[in-house]
Regions:
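Short, mixed-charge, low-aromatic patches
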Residues: 40-47, 59-66, 100-111, 168-169
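All-alpha helical catalytic cores of prenyl diphosphate-utilizing isoprenoid enzymes
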Residues: 44-67, 71-84, 116-119
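General structural signal for secondary-structure boundaries
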Residues: 29-36, 50-57, 98-101, 116
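Hydrophobic alpha-helical scaffolding
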Residues: 12-16, 51, 70, 74, ...
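Catalytic Zn2+-binding segment of zinc metalloproteases
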Residues: 1-6
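Post-HExxH zinc-binding segment in Zn-dependent metallohydrolases
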Residues: 11-50
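C-terminal, non-catalytic "cap/extension" segments appended to globular domains
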Residues: 82, 86-175
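Generic structural "secondary-structure junction" signal
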Residues: 7-8, 12, 20, 128-133
Length: 175
């Protein structure tokens, strides 16, 4: 590997939004596609999957339901998970929310936006490591990553063809 661009902007991630877009592209555009389920269904079965066909696998992977965990959230509610965290960070940093009130406020907002309530703080405000590591302001990077990955997907299809066809044919090197 060449290190000629080390410590230069060209050798670094452009932004955390771009960085997050790379994994989110594979998670949301590749793995959640029907083509992926169809191509890899037999491997899932050999690993213990008990679903009857690739369509059931695809439906299972793309199931929509509000859940407590941001990492496991569906595409419809993911943005709401980010919104709760971002708004709480802003309120905390601006002084409008004392740290000791975060669990109660978290639960309130999850109830209002997602219609669910954590049974304990581990399922709620303590589920992410970001705040304990001092990583305030990071959560919007995930939402930007989602938006950027959608743009990448759209441009990629204009440039090299339908991503579903590439997946179906196993042409991952083009992706």
């Amino acid at each position: 590997q060449s290190h000629q661009w080390f410590a230069w902007p060209l050798g670094q991630a452009t932004s955390m939004g771009i960085h997050e877009s790379q994994s989110l592209f594979w998670e949301n555009r590749i793995v959640k596609s029907k083509s992926f389920s169809k191509r890899f269904f037999k491997k899932f079965v050999s690993a213990g999957c008990t679903l009857n066909n690739y369509f059931e696998l695809w439906k299972s992977i793309n199931h929509l339901e509000a859940g407590l965990n941001r990492v496991e959230a569906d595409e419809l509610t993911y943005g709401l998970h980010i919104l709760v965290r971002t708004e709480l960070e802003i309120d905390l940093i601006e002084g409008g929310l004392p740290a000791e009130d975060i669990p109660e406020e978290w639960n309130k907002r999850y109830g209002e936006l997602l219609g669910i309530k954590p049974s304990n703080d581990s399922e709620g405000c303590l589920q992410d490591v970001h705040w304990s590591e001092g990583a305030f302001g990071y959560f919007p990077s995930y939402l930007l990553g989602h938006l950027i990955s959608a743009q990448i997907s759209s441009q990629m299809e204009r440039d090299i063809g339908l991503i579903d066809d590439l997946i179906q044919n196993g042409e991952y090197q083009k992706i």
